[in-house]
Every structure is written in C-alpha cells, then in structure tokens.
Amino acid sequence: MIKQIGNKSFLSWDDVEVLVKKLCNKITQSNLDIKDIWGLPRGGLIPAVMVSHKLGIPMTKGTITPDTLIIDDICDSGVTLANFYKTYQDEFAFPFDLKTAVLHYKPQTSVFEPTLFANQWSSNNWIIYPWERKDSKSIQDYKI
C-alpha cells in the first residue's frame, strides 16, 4: 500500500509487484516485437529484471536495437528518456522505433511519452520506490 508522507509517496515491494504485473499485461497485449529488455540505470534496472523474468524475455547482451524494450521506473520530466533517445537517434530512424515502458508516467510534466506505462500518475507527489530508501545500511556498515 502506498504510504503518503508530506509530498512523498512511498511504494512497497507489493506495490511494485502490482505495477510490474500491470506493465507485463500491457506489453503482451501490445503485440510489440520485443526481443530483449534494457533497464535504464539506476531506476529502471530493477523493474527491467522483474519484467524480464515474468515474460521470459532476456536482458540485452549489450546491443540496443529497435527490438529492445527500454524500461525505467518513472517518466516524470521525461528528460531521461528524451536524452536516451537523443543519444541513440542514429540507431533509430523514427521516435516510434524506440520502445519504452515505465511504471509511472506523469503526462502533466513530461516532455516524452513512453510507449507503455503501468500507471498514469496525476499527483505532484514525489514517488519513492523501495530500492531508493535511505534506511538501508551503507556498504561500510556491512561486516564480512
């Protein structure tokens, strides 16, 4: 269950699981030709691996092609995905060749529209995913 604290919305792992399942359903219903998946570092890595496992689509071996689904956690300002497209524009003939999927899409603030999204987020709250929590131990606190 999403926990609201001030202007922040904290998602649980269960919330993420629901969003990933919803995104997987949209991916299979889209009939997109997807051969592999690539997660944008850092926020897109975990959802990308989850989608890869659920759908049995491999993670890319390093080469991004028009058949690669690019996954990120959120498309808020859209700048990350827009910059990614600019970086790879020589690889893609048209913007619609770039297949993108996100857990949350904020159309009211984004300059980029993802191909697929699990949830359209209309709140101005900042979304905090479980992998972004500051309550984890730092690497120095672990004893081997």
Residue ranges and their predicted role:
Residues 1-144:
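PRPP-associated nucleotide enzymes
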